[in-house]
């Protein structure tokens, strides 16, 4: 297990101890009550146990991220990937770790975490991870890789952000005309997203973002 402090070790140990103490009893009761589907419930018990343990480690990771403890963040994220990759906590942990490591200047580790999250998370989580990964790659001047990370079409609601970041990468490459086109696309996508949501709250939230996109476009002499 990673090198956690005593309180964190206790949190994780408590999650494991519950299943060690009561797991057989719970599983046994289920099997007695549902003879013939014991295998299914046994698997469910295993999944529940994995989720409980992964949840405890994810809690340690988020606390470490808030404390900007890079070593502990890496250790917890690594344990989630190594032992609990089948749970939703592993990609969420990689996403949190990637952001924290990027903010701390560890671009190499951030890239590794976000790449994993972009390949193993849910659809929306993958899109968030791809956006963050592309931002890391842009900061690292890995422009072609950043554009590649943005290539697959994202889920609805992410299109404007993807187009904007594509524009940022193209601008960094000195491709002003292509960057202008990407920002124009981002504005168009944002308008479509606002129309689809049909909410005054959503429209208000999109206002400042629309202004930002327009400023980027104006800086390039676009309309």
Model-derived regions, located:
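Soluble extracytoplasmic domains of inner/organellar membrane proteins
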Residues: 84, 89, 99-223
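Short extracytoplasmic
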Residues: 56-92
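N-terminal positive-inside, membrane-proximal cytosolic segments immediately preceding the first
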Residues: 1-32
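Transmembrane signal-anchor/signal-peptide helices with a preference for the extracytoplasmic
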Residues: 2, 36-56
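Amphipathic alpha-helical repeat elements characteristic of tetratricopeptide repeat
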Residues: 9, 51-55, 71-74, 161
């Amino acid at each position: 297990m990673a090198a956690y402090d005593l309180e964190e070790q206790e949190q994780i140990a408590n999650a494991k101890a519950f299943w060690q103490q009561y797991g057989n009893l719970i599983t046994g009761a289920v099997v007695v009550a549902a003879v013939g589907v014991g295998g299914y419930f046994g698997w469910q018990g295993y999944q529940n146990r994995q989720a409980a343990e992964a949840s405890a480690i994810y809690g340690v990771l988020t606390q470490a991220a808030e404390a900007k403890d890079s070593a502990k963040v890496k250790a917890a994220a690594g344990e989630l990937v190594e032992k609990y990759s089948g749970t939703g906590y592993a990609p969420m942990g990689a996403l949190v770790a990637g952001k924290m490591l990027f903010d701390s200047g560890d671009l190499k580790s951030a890239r590794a975490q976000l790449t994993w999250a972009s390949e193993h998370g849910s659809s929306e989580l993958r899109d968030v991870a791809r956006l963050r990964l592309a931002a890391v790659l842009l900061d690292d001047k890995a422009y072609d890789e950043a554009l590649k990370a943005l290539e697959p079409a994202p889920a609805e609601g992410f299109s404007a952000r993807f187009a904007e970041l594509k524009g940022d990468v193209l601008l960094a490459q000195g491709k002003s005309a292509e960057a202008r086109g990407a920002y124009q696309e981002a504005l168009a996508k944002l308008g479509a997203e606002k129309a689809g949501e049909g909410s005054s709250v959503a429209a208000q939230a999109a206002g400042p973002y629309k202004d930002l996109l327009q400023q980027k476009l104006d800086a390039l002499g676009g309309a």
